[in-house]
């Protein structure tokens, strides 16, 4: 699962002539004691169902706190099976990044 970006990320002079069409969450950490979710994502592409980070992709970090944290934790916990919770959490986090204007694209 990744986000197909509306406009591909352009790393400019760091990787001349290349653009990265997708964003992928590579780490998500829920910290209940500080009531925050930390999301790390990268730009790159999917190649044969495997994530390939762009050569010059900066890792981006988003911290989710407050009411957004509470809402996301509640929506990610609506399943009884742990594998569904993790997949659901990733989808919810992608949607959050899109809704907040951090990413623009379609979840695939």
Predicted regions and their residues:
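Viral virion structural and adsorption modules
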Residues: 1-40, 44-108
């Amino acid at each position: 699962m990744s986000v197909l970006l509306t406009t591909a990320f352009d790393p400019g002079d760091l990787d001349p002539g290349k653009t990265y069409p997708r964003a992928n969450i590579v780490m998500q950490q829920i910290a209940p004691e500080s009531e925050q979710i930390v999301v790390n994502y990268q730009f790159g592409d999917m190649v044969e169902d495997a994530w390939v980070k762009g050569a010059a992709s900066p890792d981006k970090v988003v911290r989710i706190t407050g009411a957004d944290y509470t809402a996301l934790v509640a929506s990610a916990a609506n399943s009884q099976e742990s594998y569904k919770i993790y997949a659901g959490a990733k989808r919810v986090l992608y949607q959050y990044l899109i809704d907040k204007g951090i990413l623009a694209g379609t979840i695939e």
